[in-house]
Amino acid sequence: MQFDLLKTDGVARRGTLTLAHGVIQTPVFMPVGTYGTVKAMTPQSLNDIGAQICLGNTFHLWLRPGLEVIAAHKGLHDFMNWQKPILTDSGGFQVFSLGAMRKITEEGVKFSSPHDGAKLFLTPEISMQIQKVLNSDIVMIFDECTPYPATHEEAAKSMRMSMRWAQRSRDEHNKLENSNALFGIVQGGMHEDLRDESVAGLCDIGFDGMAIGGLSVGEPKEDMARILAHTAPQLPTHKPRYLMGVGTPEDLVYSVSAGIDMFDCVMPTRNARNGHLFTRFGDVKIKNARYKLDTGPLDSSCSCYTCTNFTRAYLHHLFRNGEILGGMLNTIHNLHFYQTIMAEMRTAIEVEHFTEWAAGFARDRSSGQ
């Protein structure tokens, strides 16, 4: 892996990230393909909307279809027919989400399969072994996502165990001779001093890139902004910075202004399937009756397949009738919109016009339909 920082505008960064399956232009948004598929999108559709890299979910792919199936395809790329880079998360967040179904110990996490109730055990070592089989370009360490809210004592205990798991992840990744990139994950809840301790510890261990975890887990926006603004500047300048699970278009712009390079979130795809569409001039809830006779495009400024071929009335009709095509067209648009935002930010940073671009984007988004 190689990361090249090409340009800065204020704190915003423009770079390239060279991985085994291609070169990524940053800042970048990564669509989420939990089960080896971005819901309602074909690999060709992902290419068409400009996706450079997508996510797979270690936890879910381990359970279904299982490693034997993916190993038979020599990894996730051939299995899902996506020859661009893939990042896989470690399974930590999914285990965290199981709540009462799991028990966290120093060794790892014991839990019951959400599919058949089978007793399972996931450790940093097993997570690294799974991700080696998946052959993802970027591997994430196994950590505990600190819940919100958490007291200082609770967050410290969680973060320090994640730090020990980070070392075990690093050791196993090396032992497996996995040549793909390994990213550390900063934890520490809403406590700046714990975030500082986490960054320092991860830097001592040594990782190819650094992620900020434990945000967008239910905390107020002000807390997320506070922790992001505090933590991002401390991350190594010469390594990619990844903000996990974020977020809205406005979140992306704010986070790029804080120095983040990489993002993922289910929001554009999940919202699309629920009829919540992002446009340049505000959000559209396509089920609303006001769109029944609307013969205009969803977003007059958008060049995606949906906006250049179909009316709001048609999208309204599809959604109201539960047609599969509705979810597909909505998802194409939302992901295209996110990719367009990222491309515009990259250009704005290149020409040192980011602040002006961000102000214009905010004006457009708040102007309404």
Swiss-Prot record:
Q: Which GO terms fall under molecular function for this chain's record?
A: metal ion binding; tRNA-guanosine(34) queuine transglycosylase activity
Amino-acid positions noted as binding substrate in the UniProt annotation, renumbered to this chain = D89, S90, G91, G92, F93, D143, Q187, G214
Sorted alphabetically, which Gene3D superfamilies does this protein's record hold?
A: Queuine tRNA-ribosyltransferase-like
User: Catalyzes what?
Assistant: 7-aminomethyl-7-carbaguanine + guanosine(34) in tRNA = 7-aminomethyl-7-carbaguanosine(34) in tRNA + guanine
* Residues of the active site: D89 (proton acceptor), D264 (nucleophile)
State where Zn(2+) binds.
C302, C304, C307, H333
Give the residue ranges for region: RNA binding: 245-251, 269-273
The enzyme's E.C. designation: 2.4.2.29
Identify the metabolic or biological route this protein is part of: tRNA modification; tRNA-queuosine biosynthesis
Example GO biological process: tRNA-guanine transglycosylation
Q: What class of enzyme is it?
A: transferase
Against SUPFAM superfamilies, the record matches this protein to: tRNA-guanine transglycosylase
Cofactor dependence: Zn(2+)
Q: Which InterPro entries match?
A: ArchSynthase1/Queuine_TRR, TGT, TGT-like_sf, tRNA_ribo_trans-like
Q: How is the cofactor bound?
A: Binds 1 zinc ion per subunit.
Q: Which family does it belong to?
A: Belongs to the queuine tRNA-ribosyltransferase family.
Listed under subunit, the entry gives: Homodimer. Within each dimer, one monomer is responsible for RNA recognition and catalysis, while the other monomer binds to the replacement base PreQ1.
Listed name of the protein: Queuine tRNA-ribosyltransferase
